[in-house]
Regions:
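Conserved catalytic phosphorylation-site environment of P-type ATPases
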Residues: 52, 62-138, 294, 313, ...
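Re-entrant/interfacial helical elements at transmembrane boundaries that shape
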Residues: 69-79, 117-120, 149-153, 315, ...
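Membrane-embedded transport module
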Residues: 30, 334, 339-415
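Signature of the cytosolic headpiece of P-type E1-E2 ATPases
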Residues: 146, 155-268, 283
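Actuator/coupling domain of P-type ATPases
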Residues: 1-54, 237-238, 352-359
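Conserved ATP-binding TGD loop and adjacent catalytic N/P-domain core of P-type ATPases
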Residues: 4, 8, 88, 180-182, ...
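Membrane-water interface of transmembrane alpha-helices in multipass transporters/channels
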Residues: 15, 29, 42-61, 69, ...
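Conserved cytosolic headpiece of P-type ATPases
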Residues: 1-2, 63-80, 107, 111-120, ...
Length: 415
């Protein structure tokens, strides 16, 4: 993947290729023009001067420096990113990243550790033996990380075995529903709770608020229109998340958090991250719509997620960034993949993009300046002033030096 990315072309490289395609015939024309000017105005040694100057123009002109300016910088930039566990899919992604002014972060698995654990159970109804068996069987079929936390907690308890379910259905962005012995059970977010019109008692509401203020995600478990239990699950915020958000802000990038959690939980997490802006109760469609709204405002948006309930938003973002532990969908869609859970790689990736593009511009600038100055000197512009006529051997040395200088300038990025 790294080799493919290093061999890809950035948009600026396509422009340079067109310029180089024009540059070569122009240089040939200038060489011929130089020859005839010397033949007409060269005086006694006009033939030797004409030959030397025409050859020097051909030799000193260096499309190589122009051609090397972009790919050498890209190869070094993408290689350095890989050294830091940042995989960049192609040169377009590397160049696009420098334009990003808004980063949208999914919460679970991106800002948090991705290792949720159950911290509490609140039973709204007297427990029956099969309730936990049904919940275990249902969550075993779910791919959501919160489901894994419930499965782990239930499996640690004695005498709980997965029930034989009649059916299973995943409800995108809300949860799951199953059938057991002809009765429908469900587990998911408070949106699913509302869909089933299940009541929440005042006592449960107060206890629930305490869990939410502690940044816990809440899973509701019910039967038909009856709430059976509430499961509080906590996923610790990564140690690097706060610092990563701070660095992104330092780079002038606005940061948003999207989460399917309720308002209180989302607010609690946002405060801990430094009072970042957030959207709570976000369904997959809501996340995609939010990214599109930012784009309509003229923003260049990077979406960072693990592919669970955010693959649509990843697909429509200007720059899609997947966490290394994300889903296969996220990996396929993502233009950039952070191979570790360290969120500090995110500001580092944006900074590396800006450094690489800045280096490309430097290389192109000096390549153009070299040709702009070198070709007239090779043609004999200084001869009437100080008698200097450039030897073709010196012209070839200057040409080689220009190419080497571009490569050396690109290699600076590694250190």
């Amino acid at each position: 993947m790294v080799q493919e990315a290093q061999g890809s072309k950035a948009p600026v490289q396509r422009i340079v290729d067109k310029v180089t395609g024009i540059f070569v015939p122009v240089v040939l024309g200038l060489s011929v023009l130089t020859f005839f000017i010397w033949m007409f105005f060269g005086g006694v040694d006009m033939l030797s001067h004409a030959m030397l100057s025409a050859v020097s123009v051909l030799v000193i002109a260096c499309p190589c420096a122009l051609g090397l300016a972009t790919p050498t910088a890209l190869m070094v930039g993408i290689g350095k990113a890989a050294d830091h566990h940042i995989l960049i899919k192609d040169a377009v992604a590397l160049e696009q990243m420098r334009k990003v002014n808004v980063v949208v972060l999914d919460k679970t698995g991106t800002l948090t550790e991705g290792h949720p654990t159950v911290t509490g159970w609140l039973w709204a109804q007297p427990q029956e033996e099969h309730y936990k068996d049904v919940l275990l069987a249902a969550e075993l079929k779910s791919e959501h990380p919160l489901a894994a936390a419930i499965v782990t907690a239930l499996q640690e308890q004695e005498h709980i075995e997965p029930a034989a379910l009649d059916s299973f259905e995943s409800i995108t962005g809300k949860g799951i529903k199953v059938s057991y012995q002809g009765t429908e059970y469900w587990a998911g977010s408070h949106k699913l709770l509302k869909d089933y019109h299940a009541a929440l008692t005042d006592v449960l509401g107060e206890m629930l608020a305490q869990y939410e203020s502690d940044s816990c995600s809440i899973i509701y478990f019910g039967r038909k229109n009856e709430l059976l239990a509430i499961v509080a699950i906590k996923d610790q915020i990564k140690a690097t998340s706060v610092e990563a958000v701070r660095e992104l802000r330092t780079q002038g990038i606005d940061v948003y958090m999207l989460t399917g959690d309720g308002e209180r939980t989302a607010s609690s997490v946002a405060v801990r991250l430094g009072n970042i802006q957030y959207i709570s109760d976000a369904m997959p469609d809501d996340k995609e719509e939010f990214v599109r709204q930012l784009q309509l405002q003229g923003k260049t948006v990077a979406m960072v997620g693990d592919g669970i309930n955010d693959s649509q938003a990843l697909a429509c973002a200007d720059v899609s960034i997947a966490m290394g532990k994300g889903t296969d969908i996220a990996m396929d869609v993502a233009m950039v993949t952070l191979m570790t859970s360290d969120l500090l790689l995110l500001p580092k990736a944006f900074n590396l993009s800006r450094q690489t593009v800045r280096l490309i511009h430097q290389n192109l600038f000096w390549a153009f300046i070299y040709n702009l100055i070198g070709i007239p000197i090779a043609a004999g512009l200084l001869y009437p002033i100080n008698g200097l006529l450039l030897n073709p051997m010196l012209a070839s040395a200057a040409m080689a030096f220009s190419s080497v200088s571009v490569v050396l300038n690109s290699l600076r990025l590694r250190y």
